[in-house]
């Protein structure tokens, strides 16, 4: 994906957020004082595994038959700031292990290659609630702080510089998904399924974009104070 398309996609998401947020705030104002359901704010702990892969661009489409996903740890925290009973803003910070595998005898090399990246990721999502079900989407940024490349049985650390075979530390993308909440007294348990689409070419000398599917379990505790809520109790 070129820079113009990336910029257009991000701009469209920002406009969508602004329009949705404005409409929901207006709707919340109209319903205030009418006994509306209060906005819900939660702090979550989450831990699970993520299945990630790499996209090598249109110029290397022949590699699609040789790609295999890799599993990695995904753990961190999430904060859902309720705006109204139907809309929340969600920010997260977590560690994730990304990467992908190319089987042997592929068009690039005769050897099996596994790339792994260790990153901290920060998504900011718009979440729409439909009872216990929700949908969310938004941009994310990640910082790749280390990584390894394993060729056959030999593993070596990758470099983050402008040299050949180097990688970029910063990565940006978009996430979209849905979830279901299971109330447990004043707490809740949530199952979240999300697709992650990388927009940044993380390689210095070829096309390489992150892709991932995250299925996570969130252990939630209510957060009593939320300055963003439209229908705060007094």
Sequence positions of predicted segments:
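Short glycine/proline- and aromatic-enriched beta-strand/turn motifs that initiate or cap beta-hairpins
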Residues: 21-78
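Glycine- and aromatic-enriched membrane insertion/assembly motifs of diderm outer-membrane
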Residues: 44, 62-110, 120
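Residues on the lipid-exposed face of transmembrane beta-strands in outer-membrane beta-barrel proteins
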Residues: 45-49, 73-83, 93-95, 122-128, ...
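Cleavable N-terminal export/targeting peptides
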Residues: 1-39, 222-234
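Flexible, solvent-exposed loop segments that connect beta-strands
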Residues: 54-67, 98-118, 145-170, 203-205, ...
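Residues that define the transmembrane beta-barrel architecture of outer-membrane proteins
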Residues: 39-41, 69-73, 116-120, 131, ...
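Outer-membrane beta-barrel "beta-signal"
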Residues: 182, 209-234
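Outer-membrane beta-barrel channels and translocator barrels
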Residues: 38, 82-86, 130-133, 183-185, ...
């Amino acid at each position: 994906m070129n820079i113009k398309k990336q910029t257009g996609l991000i701009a469209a998401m920002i406009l969508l957020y602004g329009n949705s947020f404005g409409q929901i705030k207006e709707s919340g104002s109209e319903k205030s004082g009418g006994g509306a359901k209060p906005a819900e704010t939660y702090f979550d702990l989450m831990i699970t595994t993520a299945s990630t892969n790499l996209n090598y661009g249109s110029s290397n489409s022949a590699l699609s038959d040789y790609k295999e996903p890799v599993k990695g740890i995904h753990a961190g925290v999430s904060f859902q700031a309720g705006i109204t009973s139907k809309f929340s803003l969600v920010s997260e910070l977590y560690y994730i292990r990304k990467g992908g595998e190319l089987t042997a005898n592929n068009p690039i090399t005769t050897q099996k290659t596994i790339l792994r990246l260790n990153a901290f990721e920060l998504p900011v999502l718009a979440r729409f609630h439909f009872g216990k079900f929700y949908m969310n989407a938004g941009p994310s940024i990640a910082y790749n702080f280390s990584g390894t490349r394993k060729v056959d049985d030999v593993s070596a650390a990758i470099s983050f510089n402008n040299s050949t075979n180097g990688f970029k530390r910063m990565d940006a993308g978009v996430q979209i998904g849905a979830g279901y909440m299971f109330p447990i007294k004043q707490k809740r348990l949530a199952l979240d399924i999300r697709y992650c689409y990388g927009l940044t070419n993380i390689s210095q000398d070829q096309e390489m974009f992150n892709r991932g599917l995250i299925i996570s379990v969130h252990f939630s505790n209510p957060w009593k104070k939320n300055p963003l809520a439209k229908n705060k109790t007094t």
